[in-house]
């Protein structure tokens, strides 16, 4: 029996590229602009984007890449290794972090795009008695703002971000906190996600199951994910849960 459904946010409830591609572009090109003029390397914004799984020319984000599956801390760590040794430390420079936050607010605010029809299935699941939670590698405040933008924040008993104090996925602690908040055991809780980080969190937390959101079975992040657990949009989730309850 399932009591709690824990959702990843981007690529599951939200259209990852439509919502976040403008932010990724802005932050990468700003970061490249901070490279000292005396460096003889050849790294630009396009290279920084490619390193985190973003193809700027094609306008595509790889669901297996760092941008889709990691946190902003993971992105900064990846970029720092590519940048000159005498450049600012991205995770320590306050001006850089403030400027990035301004860019995120400017390019991300009011740009929340759902991945198809999401409100109706989420409300149906809530009506069916499931508790719902969000577990994202984005920040908690950003996740709450996104859910408010699409009118579904009221449905979630818990929203956990990478900065909420429980670590980031694929660690288990965010998932376990969602379970604690809902009064549900991990075995009675499932994770709905699209990346290896989501699947890894479910495995680490000993979740009851994992539902994958992917365009096709071949796009699932791990071959151990059962074919019948792959859906292309969450509007298929209420019917899937109904079938599972009959088993």
What kind of feature is each model-predicted range?
Residues 1-56:
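Active-site neighborhood of HAD-like aspartate-dependent phosphohydrolases
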Residues 1-5, 18, 33, 119, ...:
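Asp-based, Mg2+/Mn2+-dependent phosphohydrolase catalytic module
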Residues 12, 136-138:
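Conserved phosphate-coupling serine/threonine residues in phosphotransfer and NTP-handling enzymes
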Residues 20-31, 53, 75-79, 97-104, ...:
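Hydrophobic alpha-helical core bundles mediating ligand binding, dimerization, or RNAP-core interactions
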Residues 47-103, 116-119, 123-124:
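A metal-dependent, Asp-based hydrolase signature
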Residues 64-67, 110, 166-167, 229:
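Pocket-edge positions in alpha/beta enzyme catalytic cores
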Residues 109-115, 136:
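Conserved beta-strand/loop elements of the cytosolic catalytic core of P-type E1-E2 ATPases, chiefly
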């Amino acid at each position: 029996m399932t009591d709690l459904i824990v959702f990843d946010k981007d690529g599951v409830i939200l259209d990852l590229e439509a919502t976040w591609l403008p932010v990724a572009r802005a932050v990468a090109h700003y970061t490249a602009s901070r490279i000292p003029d005396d460096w003889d390397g050849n790294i630009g914004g396009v290279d920084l984007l490619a390193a985190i799984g973003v193809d700027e020319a094609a306008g595509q984000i790889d669901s297996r890449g760092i941008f889709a599956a990691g946190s902003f801390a993971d992105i900064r760590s990846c970029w720092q290794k590519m940048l000159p040794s005498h450049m600012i430390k991205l995770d320590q420079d306050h001006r850089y972090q403030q400027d990035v936050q301004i860019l995120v607010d400017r390019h991300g605010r009011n740009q929340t795009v759902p991945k198809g029809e999401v409100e109706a299935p989420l409300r149906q699941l809530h009506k069916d008695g499931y508790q719902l939670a969000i577990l994202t590698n984005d920040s908690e405040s950003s996740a709450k703002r996104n859910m408010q933008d699409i009118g579904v924040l009221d449905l979630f008993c818990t929203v956990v971000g990478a900065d909420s104090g429980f670590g980031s996925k694929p660690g288990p602690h965010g998932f376990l906190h969602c379970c604690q908040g809902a009064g549900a055991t991990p075995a009675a809780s499932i994770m709905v996600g699209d990346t290896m980080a989501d699947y890894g969190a479910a495995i680490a937390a000993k979740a009851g199951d994992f539902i994958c959101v992917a365009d096709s079975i071949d796009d699932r992040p791990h071959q151990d994910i059962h074919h019948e657990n792959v859906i292309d949009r969450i509007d298929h989730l209420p019917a899937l849960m109904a079938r599972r309850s009959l088993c």
